[in-house]
Amino acid sequence: MQKRKISNSELNRLTPEEFRKANKNPIIIVLDNMRSHNNIGSIFRTADAFLIEAIYLCGITACPPHRDIHKTALGATETVEWKYFEKTETAIEELKSAGYIIYAVEQVENATNLDKLNINKETKI
């Protein structure tokens, strides 16, 4: 049995214009010196799916347009706002001054599982 690819309209995916106008979740993802272009594209795609406010790309993290990012982002670089910072610290300072709470995500010993965080709808992260 051959499987049919579902269209954007069947997925109820917003057009780029609709996405720009949509209410976003007050979350900004900061990518700190991420090397993998494919992972960067995947994060754009995930941010698009969850209506994330923006992505901040820092240091050596590649920026769109880039063919490897585009390949995995599947159009999300056209919808999700992004900004480049030479230094991650500058991005963090901007977010703190705008009232965001900063969380670092890393797989390390004694880390808190993301599903255990106590975050309410009004929290800007």
Predicted segments with their positions:
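Post-transcriptional modification and biogenesis factors for structured RNAs
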Residues: 1-125
